Amino acid sequence: MKRLLTLLTLALLLLTLGTTAAQESCTAILGCDPTLRGLPDEVMAAYPEPNVIQLPIDDSLIYDRLYRKVTAPTQVFDAPGGSPISDHGGGFSYVTVNSIAGDWTQIDTNQWIPSNVLSDDVLISRYAGIRLPAEPLPYPVAWIMRHLNPAAEPGADPSDFNPFLYRYTKVNLYTYVEIDGFRWYQIGPEQWVHQFNVAKMTPIQRPAEVETHKWVGIDLYEQTLIAYEGETPVFATLISSGLEKWPTNEGLFNVYLRFERTTMSGAFQQEDFYSLQEVPWTMYFDGDIALHGTYWHDGFGYRHSHGCVNMSITDAHWLYDWSRDELDRSVPDDKDLSVYVYSSGQYNP
């Protein structure tokens, strides 16, 4: 009997310790349950999905050009079967298809390359960001970053009983608990995801140094961008910033040069050579670092670039059009869109 009482006492002590840990990490939003169950179902049912407006997809904008990857070094000719005029070094290179004549592809005026060094047409991302309501959102909004089934409880394996969520699905983050130093977010009744599986949108206060009415905040940790009018967030999306070798610099900048289409290239005769024709909706803000549309990948939410801030074509067009009236050239020393780059957490590559 004495041994049984000892075991019962030990079990109760362990349960108390576990509950205490949950109480400390639970955010207690609208009655969070500290037993790792999260918010009551009826509370989440009042806000079953984010109250945001999906940016519409304009196929005529996305597919107005054909892009192909250059898969091997080649020469550029002045006509199909004509004379070589330059070398194309391969590397990370994409071109615009202007026309096709037999086994030749025109990539610019009087510039042709053999079609056999080109990939099939590039599949352009149809991802797009969200417009935000005037009133504050009741819960943080996030995007699911990989296809998954949520776990039934924090720290558990994916549950086949939960719905399958596709990458880029938008979810509310109702609350969280911390396990082993990492957050597990509740996104629905008995639905939990690890913090590495979401990209969270968190509006910030306007930095005192921002002088323009319209500005954007770029969070390198979450890989998100939020556009603001004054203090009010109006738009949010996923981006891809620079890789560790080519980081996007933190700080406050202003757009100083805009192009609806421009060619980007660099690292000539090096392993990381790149050449990208007709990069859409480009806004330079920090030397040769720019915000721009991206037709060559669909990896938004992850670092991917040589320093630029990659956006989907839909998002880049929206941002370019929304901010084009910020600079008043009739006003001396007026400034274009402010770009505030920061990190909300510590990135560990």
Question: Which sequence ranges carry the predicted segments?
Answer:
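Short, solvent-exposed interaction modules
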Residues: 78, 129-174
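SH3/SH3-like beta-barrel superfamily modules
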Residues: 24-32, 82-119, 163-199
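Cell wall/extracellular polymer interaction/catalysis modules
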Residues: 157-249
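Bacterial N-terminal signal peptides that target proteins for export
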Residues: 1-8
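Exported/periplasmic cell-wall-interacting domains
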Residues: 23, 209-211, 235, 243, ...
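Boundary regions of SH3-family modules and the immediately adjacent low-complexity/disordered segments
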Residues: 23-64, 108-142, 186-215
